Amino acid sequence: MDAVAVEPVRSSAVGLPAQLRDLGHQSYGPVWRAMQRFTDARDERTADEVWVVEHAPVFTLGQAGKPEHVLAPGDIPVLQVDRGGQVTYHGPGQLVVYPLLDLRRLKIGVRDYVCKIEQALIGMLDEWNIVAERRDGAPGVYVGGAKIAALGIRVRRGCTFHGLSLNVDMDLEPFHRINPCGYQGLQVTSVLDLGGPSGMDAVKAVLLEQLARQFGLVLQPASALPDLSLPA
């Protein structure tokens, strides 16, 4: 995956600085542990960060996840994780964004945080005339009843980790091996299937711009990756 352009991604007004890190292609586990370490170590002086990544194939079960919603995982690993929500799939061709934000600094609550992420996704899809919507009680973004983006977050001491996944140009077959987000028979779709671009960079740029606008951030690309080592 190509690196994000070096120019800062700005909101429409002067905003709070946040480090933007493009992790490329990574397994889920090391990134998850790195998010935990970052969140545990941060304090009120720590700058916010936004991480973008494509994961190797994996099913993740959130805190509300039920094993029976994993129908036939086959050769794809299943991980129990500490985010909210139920079961979802991550894989190549899916854009995953982890906003590591201090909600107290942004002066917003958890509900507003979720709504702003959903609105950023809706605004991004509108760039390609894809009409999307949110659903009460079912976080994420939907197009014509099919889910195109999933949300699963965790808030610790007022700071967020985990985040969103957007199906861009990917093999959707693994979603048939689960009840996505705990809903039997829930249909899923992708940006490409709805007439949008297949290129990850085009989608990434617009989504980051929308997220920066929603949260009032100035995203400053950082070349260094977080420590992705797993604990012994």
Swiss-Prot record:
Substrate binds at residues 83-90, 150-152, 163-165. This is Octanoyltransferase. Pfam families: LplA-B_cat (PF21948). The record marks 147 as: Lowers pKa of active site Cys. It comes from Xanthomonas oryzae pv. oryzae (strain KACC10331 / KXO85). It is found in: Cytoplasm. Its EC number is 2.3.1.181. It comes from the Bacteria. Residues 44-219 form the BPL/LPL catalytic domain. The keyword Transferase applies. In the reaction, the free carboxyl group of octanoic acid is attached via an amide linkage to the epsilon-amino group of a specific lysine residue of lipoyl domains of lipoate-dependent enzymes. It catalyses: octanoyl-[ACP] + L-lysyl-[protein] = N(6)-octanoyl-L-lysyl-[protein] + holo-[ACP] + H(+). Keywords: Acyltransferase, Cytoplasm, Transferase. GO terms for cellular component: cytoplasm. One of its GO terms (molecular function) is lipoyl(octanoyl) transferase activity. HAMAP family: LipB. GO terms for biological process: protein modification process. Belongs to the LipB family.
